[in-house]
């Protein structure tokens, strides 16, 4: 099962109307197929649960999708070396300088020649659609990767009205108060990692293995620094980095949580996949609800 390592959360501004069959049909329009010899890249949906033909995995009102991107790796210096050699030979042969359009045509030939021998870089991005709460969670550490996956879903469905989830109260202000006033919510425990910043000219201070209750940190906060990233733990469930933009990074689920389904035989892969998905989505749904409560709910959209 794909245990999410990062969370970028999006609000569906309009409910999606689909059935399991219509969703499968829509996803098949953008199904992933491996690169052929002449392909630079391929991007599409693959099976979340291996061994099945379904391009989505559903339990109740929770849906899991898996986007697969394959990119051929052609080092620029390899292309450049081969291209320069060909240009030199042709210019000597014809005793003239090649035009720009001719050089581009040669470059295209070089790329076509090298592609079949190029290695592939494969990357998968998981998306979880919570149709009950109208949220989409993307396991991505960068906005571009998340937006690429959402664009693929939008292409498959025809439309996808989403906006990033935002809290009503500024996370940096609230997180700073937690540490400055020693008032972290009872269900959360601050760990020894944070990032602080002030004005644009004051730079960024990154703290690791640092007691956030220390005099050094208090001095920085009293001087007007704000906490923009904070490492937190939810006891017996998971730890994560909470960012000021409402994204979560470096999710690490507690061993005692991940072991809850160990009574299911390893041979029964589908049942374990199902149970782990239910477990993970249950924890993250509650985490989202808790964070929304701590930060004053969801920011009103204009």
Swiss-Prot record:
UniProt GO BP: DNA recombination; regulation of DNA recombination
Domain of life: Bacteria
Main location, first listed in the record: cytoplasm
Recorded GO MF terms: double-stranded DNA binding
Disulfide bond positions: none
Keyword S-adenosyl-L-methionine appears in the UniProt entry: no
Gene Ontology CC annotation, any one: cytoplasm
Keywords: Cytoplasm, DNA recombination
Subcellular localization, as worded in the UniProt entry: Cytoplasm, Nucleoid
Family from the record: Belongs to the RdgC family.
HAMAP family: RdgC
Function summary: May be involved in recombination.
Protein name as catalogued: Recombination-associated protein RdgC
Organism: Pasteurella multocida (strain Pm70)
Gene: rdgC
